[in-house]
């Protein structure tokens, strides 16, 4: 089961206050429902691939309306051939859709009533229903952080975005295929949203994974930085050793001033050491990092003069 499925499973098991559960049902029907006309009557079908969500829609309809509904299971004939589930109402559709403020004079309303936004508990329930209907969230272990909710209508998408940003979630919106999405990219905000809609266990799991992942990334950055520094030291050390060997072959290390001799011998004997550590190995030391660097530069200059065939005044 995917992480998103785990989140939705937890949400379908959540007990919601009677006064707020209708807001969740409103979102589920508005975003997953479709209307057809049979015998001059509206028939409402709410479709989902998640059996737990289908059962929740069925229970909520039964909880609020004294109307018989049916739960239909069908099988896709393409691709994965998964089951999908339809909750269908053949009677009372008009009354239910009007009560849920989805239908007005036989027209589908694309937006949520403005007065609805004044009730914090209902907003949270509506967002929970919206996520159950068309939401998705990436697995925090394997993917980039991303949570989104899809809307068919732009006005409705704007409302979803506004609802989420009431809680400082920094939600953004964009057009996607034949509709629109509101999405979150920040790990902290995704965790806040999961908590907001009641997915507490999923939020805690998300946070645990995020902490481990961030720690792993931090360790990797440190290791990469240290590796880069070691590579830099190794490259510089190789160049210094090549130059010292050239000086020894053409002139002789023993012909160098004592300070340069000490550094040359120390570097040849300890090619892997940093400048700081090298300074502590000098017989007359310890020598500061800048002091060692200065002497090695002198040796490099001598080697370059030898390569250029110039006279070496420092000898």
Swiss-Prot record:
Iron recorded as keyword: no
Domain of life: Bacteria
Pfam families tied to this protein: HTH_WhiA, LAGLIDADG_WhiA, WhiA_N
Any one Gene Ontology BP term: cell division
GO molecular function, one term: DNA binding
DNA-binding region: 274-308
Cell cycle found in the keyword field: yes
Function: Involved in cell division and chromosome segregation.
Record family assignment: Belongs to the WhiA family.
Protein name: Probable cell division protein WhiA
Taxon lineage: Bacteria, Bacillati, Bacillota, Bacilli, Lactobacillales
Gene: whiA
């Amino acid at each position: 089961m995917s992480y998103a499925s785990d989140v939705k499973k937890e949400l379908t098991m959540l007990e919601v206050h009677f006064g707020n559960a209708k807001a969740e049902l409103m979102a589920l029907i508005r975003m997953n429902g479709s209307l057809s006309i049979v015998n001059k009557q509206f028939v409402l079908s709410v479709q989902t691939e998640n059996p737990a969500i289908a059962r929740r829609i069925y229970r909520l309809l039964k909880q609020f309306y004294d109307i018989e509904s049916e739960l239909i299971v069908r099988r896709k004939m393409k691709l994965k051939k998964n089951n999908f589930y339809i909750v269908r109402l053949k009677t009372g559709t008009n009354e239910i859709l009007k009560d849920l403020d989805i239908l007005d004079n036989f027209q589908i309303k694309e937006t949520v009533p403005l007065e609805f936004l004044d009730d914090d508990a209902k907003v949270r329930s509506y967002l929970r229903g919206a996520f159950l209907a068309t939401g998705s969230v990436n697995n925090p272990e394997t993917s980039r952080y991303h949570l989104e909710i899809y809307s068919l209508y732009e006005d409705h998408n704007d409302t979803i975005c506004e609802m989420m940003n009431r809680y400082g979630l920094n939600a953004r919106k964009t057009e996607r295929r034949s509709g629109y999405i509101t999405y979150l990219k920040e790990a902290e905000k995704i965790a806040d949203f999961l908590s907001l809609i009641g997915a507490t266990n999923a939020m805690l799991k998300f946070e645990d994974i995020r902490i481990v992942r961030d720690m792993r990334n931090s360790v990797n950055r440190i290791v990469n930085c240290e590796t880069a520094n070691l590579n830099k030291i190794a490259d510089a050390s190789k160049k210094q050793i090549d130059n010292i060997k050239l000086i020894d072959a053409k002139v002789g290390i023993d012909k160098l001033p004592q300070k340069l001799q000490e550094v040359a011998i120390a570097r040849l004997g300890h090619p892997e050491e940093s400048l700081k550590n090298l300074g502590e190995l000098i017989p007359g030391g310890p020598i500061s990092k800048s002091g060692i660097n200065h002497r090695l530069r002198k040796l490099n200059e001598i080697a370059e003069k030898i390569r250029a065939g110039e006279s070496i005044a420092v000898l």
